[in-house]
Amino acid sequence: MITIRGLAKSFGKLEVLKDITLDVRAGKVVAILGPSGSGKSTLLLCINGLEELTKGSIEVNGIIVFDSQSKKERVKHVRDIRKNTGMVFQQFNLYPHKTALENVIEALLTVKKMEKSTAVGLGEELLKRVGLFDKRDVYPSRLSGGQQQRVAISRALAMDPAVMLFDEPTSSLDPELVDEVLNVIQELAKEGMTLVIVTHEMQFARNVADRIIFMADGVVVEEGQPKDFFAAPKTERARKFLKMEEKSERNEEKL
């Protein structure tokens, strides 16, 4: 489904990703963990073509982008990759002047050129799927953060992607709203959708992911099954990270 080989990404002299090589199989859930500044979000942006790779190659659902490709071919392949991927960001990025339903169907009308009645029917089904059918005519300003993020998930699903990418989808939410978004993602996992999730929700990653990828300083430090990673991380860097996360969780529980 996703094949990455020797991926590097630099912003000027700053090398953010360094020789990343990994695979994501169809129907699997991969959680990417790591401290802030480790390159996790940049990796997702490169997969989705929102950031141009500096070196290496990325293949998504049989479509490949690589460093020595002609500009014309790369632009075409990036466009095709975006059609195969849905992305949900930390910020919801909903159109404030459009209702929940209008946000969901916007791309169906403008990109897929779908008939409005068909798009509305699909949009309503997607809002039902995330428990927001009754909010279809509500504007984002009247929705909670968790509800807005669920609308954003519906919007990404509307394009029928082969893989969903989540960039810390709960980081902007109040603690009491986190579970409603995680529950939607968990349902997608149960349905067998391919998911790549950057997250700081350790318990969620432990319960839902098929594989953990731990990044630090722009490289993949460690990867493995959740039960192995959380019980006995192989590297000192991963052990230190998990201890810090456990300490943070304990402090939050005291508040």
Locations of the language-model features?
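Helix-to-loop junction immediately C-terminal to a conserved catalytic motif
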Residues: 48
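Conserved ABC transporter NBD signature motif
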Residues: 56-67
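ABC ATPase NBD coupling module
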Residues: 65-86, 117, 232-233
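Conserved signature/switch motifs of ABC ATPase nucleotide-binding domains
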Residues: 138-141, 159, 191
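Catalytic Walker B motif of ABC-type/P-loop ATPase nucleotide-binding domains
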Residues: 164-167
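ABC ATPase "signature
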Residues: 223-224
